Amino acid sequence: MSDKLFHDLVTLFVVVNPIGVVPLFIAVAGHESAAARRRIAGQAILISTVILFVFIGIGQIVLEALGINLASFRIAGGLVLLIIALRMVLQEAHDPRADSSAIYGNIAVFPLAMPFIAGPASIMAVVLMTDNNVYSVRQEVETAALLVVVLGFTYGCLVGADFVLRLLGLTGANVASRIMGLTVAALAV
C-alpha cells in the first residue's frame, strides 16, 4: 500500500469515525427492531455514499466556480477539522441510550448521514484527496475505493452497534471518540 493510500485510509477512517457514530446510532435508533436498525443503517450509508461521491465528482468544480481555491479550502477545512476535533475531545460523556431528543423525519438522513457520516470533515477530506490538479484518475479511483471500504466498515459498526457498545462500553466508546478527536486535531494542523 502506497503512502498516499495509507494516509487516505487513515484520514477517511478518522473523519467518518465509524466507532464514534455508534453511540449516536444507538441514541436515535436503539428503540427500533433489529430489521429497522439494519434498514436505517443501510439508508444512512447509501445517502452518505451518494453525498461523498457527488463531492468526489464535482466538489472541486463547484469550489472553482465559486472562486474558492483548494489552498483556501484546505485552510478553512483545517480550521473546521480543528473545531470538530476540539468538540470530540472536550464533549461531555453521556449515555446515548438516555438521550431523549426529539427525532424528526428520517433519522437515516439527519443526523446519521448528515452531518455525522458525511459531515463537513468527510466532505472536505474527499475533495482534497481527489484534487484533479494533483492526483491521477487512478489515484482518485483508489481513494474512492477506500471510501467504500470505510463506509462498509461503518455499516458493519452500525448493524453491530449493540455488540460494539457492549464490547467497548460507554466509557470505551467515549474514549474512542476522543482519540479520534485528537487524531482529527493532528490532521487539522
Where are each of the predicted segments found?
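Membrane interface segments of multi-pass transport proteins and intramembrane proteases
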Residues: G67-A71, G156-A176
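Generic transmembrane alpha-helix signature in multi-pass membrane proteins
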Residues: F13, V22-V28, F110-P115, I123-N132
